[in-house]
Amino acid sequence: MSRPKHSKFRSIFLPPLTDASDRMQRRRVILKGISAAVGAGLSMPSLAQSTLPVVRIGYQKFNTLNILKETGYLEKALAPLGTKVEWREFLVTSLVTEAITAGALDIGHASDGIGVFQQAQGKGLAYLASESPYPEGVGFLVPSHSPIKSIRDLKGQKIAIGRGYNTHYLLTKALEANGMTNSDVDIVYIQLPSDHLAAYQAGKVAAVGLWDPFLAAAQVATDSRLLFDGTGFTGNRTYHFAQPNFAKAHRDVVKIIFTELEKANQWAQRYPNEVIDLFSRQLKIPPDVITLATKRRRYGLTALTPAIAREQQDLADVFLRLKLIPKAVDVKEAFLNLDVV
C-alpha cells in the first residue's frame, strides 16, 4: 500500500486542542451563520423556573454539540433560568455515558452501540433524542489493487474492526445479507483507529472498518477503495443520553438544550463550507478530509420514533447473538419521550 499523501496523517487520528484565538474567531463566524440560518424558524420554549445552577454536558469533537459549544448560544438561552453550562470534552463517547451514570455529567451523546451496552449493563441511562442517520460515515476499505471486489470476496480474509463498534455491527449485517456469518471471515479486533490503519497499511489485514472522520482520512491519505459503507445496513446514529430522573426534573433545561442544538444542526446543514473550516481547524486535519465526511453527512435532530426503536433493537439483538452483551434488552424501555425535540 502506498504511503500517506499527507504529512499530517498521524495527527488525524490524534487531534490536538485548539488555542483560544482560534475559538473566538470561529465563534464569531458561527454566530453570524446560525443567526442567518435559523432566523425566526425556531421559537424559544417557554421557560419554567429551574433549580439547576449548572448543567454539565459531555461531548466529543466532530459533533454538533461541539458546534453548539462554539456559539455560546446555549449559555445565553439558559441565563434566564439562572443555569450555567459546563462543557467537558471526551476522547471517546463510552466515557461520556460512564460519566453520566457516575453522576459526573448530566447529559451527553454517544454512538448507537454504546447505548445498547449501557442498557445491557443495567446503567439506567435514558435515550432522549437521535441525530440524523449517517450510514455513509462508516465503511470498509481495501487497497485499490486488491482482488476483493465484493462483500462475498471477504470470505476467509482478515478484517480489522473494533469489538462491539459500529464496524462490528455493519460487518455482521453485510455478511448476513450475502449469505455468510462472522465465522466465514478472520476478524482481527483492534481498539484504536490509529492501530486499525497501522495494521491495514502494513498489509496485516485485507480490509479495515472505520468511521468518520477516520474513514474519510484513510480514503484521502491512502491508496484505497471503499468496498461498502453502511447504506442499507445501518443508520449509524448518534444518540443523546441522560439519567431519566435528571431529564424529568429539568425538562425545561433539556428542551432549551435541544432547541439550541437543532439551530446548530440547521446551520451545519445549510453552511457546509463553514463546517469544513470549523472542524478542519479544530481537529487540525486537512480540509479535504472534512470535505469528504461533510458531503455524506446530514445534520439534524429527531425525536425518538418506533422506527428508530426497531433500528436500535436490531443492533441489540445482533450484539446479543454475538455474545457482546450478557442479556437481551428491550430498547424501547430506555426511550424517554419528553417532547423536548
Predicted segments — roles?
Residues 65, 134-140, 224-225, 236-240, ...:
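Small-molecule pocket liners
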Residues 49-181, 187-190, 196, 206-212, ...:
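Short, glycine-/small- and polar/acidic-enriched structural segments
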Residues 1-25, 32, 36-40:
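N-terminal secretory signal peptides
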Residues 319-341:
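Conserved C-terminal helix/tail region of periplasmic/extracytoplasmic solute-binding proteins
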Residues 249-324:
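Secondary-structure end/capping motifs
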Residues 113, 187-281:
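Pocket-lining segment of extracytoplasmic ligand-binding domains
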